[in-house]
Regions:
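Small-residue-rich anion-binding loops in enzyme active sites
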Residues: 26-99
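Conserved small/polar residues in nucleotide/adenosyl-binding loops
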Residues: 100-106
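Charged, compositionally biased N-terminal leader segments and the immediate start
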Residues: 1-26
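Short amphipathic alpha-helical surface micro-motifs
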Residues: 1, 11-14, 77-84, 104
């Protein structure tokens, strides 16, 4: 997938170049040229690291799926119990997503 600058739509780069560069030369953000559709039923059947790799892989097409899966497992593996975070109730209808690895939320 290619990414274009928000300040110059003719400035198009690969995902890896957008990540390495951060901002485009003229100070714009890099955004994807399209937003892939996700099969919700299929994606929900995956564990969190697999889900993350599958979704991110649709945007970072110049990285191998194997690399993305290993990165997702390393990021969301044992330290997170395979989850992205913990939803803690704040009130009856409000929850906060805790994004740390402490077991204090258990």
């Amino acid at each position: 997938m290619q990414f274009f600058s928000t300040r110059d739509h003719n400035r198009v780069v690969s995902a890896s170049q957008a990540i390495a560069q951060g901002l485009s030369d003229e100070g714009g953000l890099f955004v994807p040229q399209s937003f892939p559709q996700v099969d919700v039923k299929a994606i929900c059947a995956l564990d969190y690291p697999e889900m993350a790799a599958a979704i991110v892989g649709q945007y970072l097409t110049d990285y191998s799926q194997e690399f993305l899966q290993e990165a997702a497992k390393a990021t969301y593996g044992a330290a997170f119990g395979g989850k992205a975070g913990y939803l803690a109730p704040v009130s009856d209808e409000v929850y906060s997503c805790l994004l740390y690895t402490s077991d204090a939320a258990d």
